[in-house]
Amino acid sequence: MAGKSSGDRRKPLRGAKGGKNAAPAKSIRVGVIDYKDVATLRKFISERGKIRARRITGVSVQEQRLIARAVKNAREMALLPYAGSGR
């Protein structure tokens, strides 16, 4: 076997240097997530306007559901855009 196996080409695991970011929802309580609080909701939305995944934000299942519902309500009320700012 001359070449390396395909398992060696994986991305390196996050170590002490590249740990997870602090969860934005940890600073606020679950019941406080409201569709009118646009500044808080923007923490959970990507630059393209998509709702960030739980594994990125670090929130629980229940918190993710509340965040998703609040973002959708804010979009319906025209407080948040459906799409990001574009290119």
Swiss-Prot record:
GO molecular function per UniProt: small ribosomal subunit rRNA binding; structural constituent of ribosome
Organism domain of life: Bacteria
Region (Disordered): 1-23
Keywords tagged on the record: Ribonucleoprotein, Ribosomal protein, RNA-binding, rRNA-binding
The UniProt record lists the keyword rRNA-binding: yes
Any one of the GO BP annotations: translation
A GO CC term attached to the entry: cytosolic small ribosomal subunit
Chain intervals with Basic and acidic residues compositional bias: 1-10
Subunit structure, interactors included: Part of the 30S ribosomal subunit. Forms a tight heterodimer with protein bS6.
PANTHER family recorded: 30S RIBOSOMAL PROTEIN S18, SMALL RIBOSOMAL SUBUNIT PROTEIN BS18M
Function according to Swiss-Prot or TrEMBL: Binds as a heterodimer with protein bS6 to the central domain of the 16S rRNA, where it helps stabilize the platform of the 30S subunit.
Family: Belongs to the bacterial ribosomal protein bS18 family.
Protein name, as recorded: Small ribosomal subunit protein bS18
Protein species of origin: Clavibacter michiganensis subsp. michiganensis (strain NCPPB 382)
